[in-house]
Amino acid sequence: MSTIKSFEELPVWKDARKFANKIYNLTKKFPKEENYGLTSQITRATVSIGSNIAEGFDRYSKKDFIKYLIIARGSISEIQNDLYIALDLKYINQNDFQETYALTKELGKQINGFIKYLRSYDKNNSKDDKVNEEYYKYDFWTSYFLIGKSANWRIG
């Protein structure tokens, strides 16, 4: 079994990265006057997902990691709201909205599954919230299947 040694190995972080690229490409269609408005808001929330996954991974407790995953999940809700606004303002079409919204749902499911896994791991394996300071030690394949295989992302 494999041990994940960095956040870059997490399937959920990889998908958050792909999603960020998708959002950046989508917001290129937004009017220039939105650069400091909706465009900035949705891209900052999108970057926040991967950033919180990465930051949480390097914390020294599963409890902290879960806290950062919950923040990442909140950013997904923020993006969903922003997608509705972009649709209402006709910055994106219905197809782009549906496709991107579906990706937010998938990413949210992955994060929820990962939170559930970390909580169950803590209950089943340790009363001590501290984890190895060098790496988080958990079975990669178990977590991979619990949080779902990487979504079939289409970028571009």
Question: What are these model-derived regions, one by one?
Answer:
Residues M1-E55, R59-G156:
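Short, C-terminally biased terminal segments at protein or domain edges
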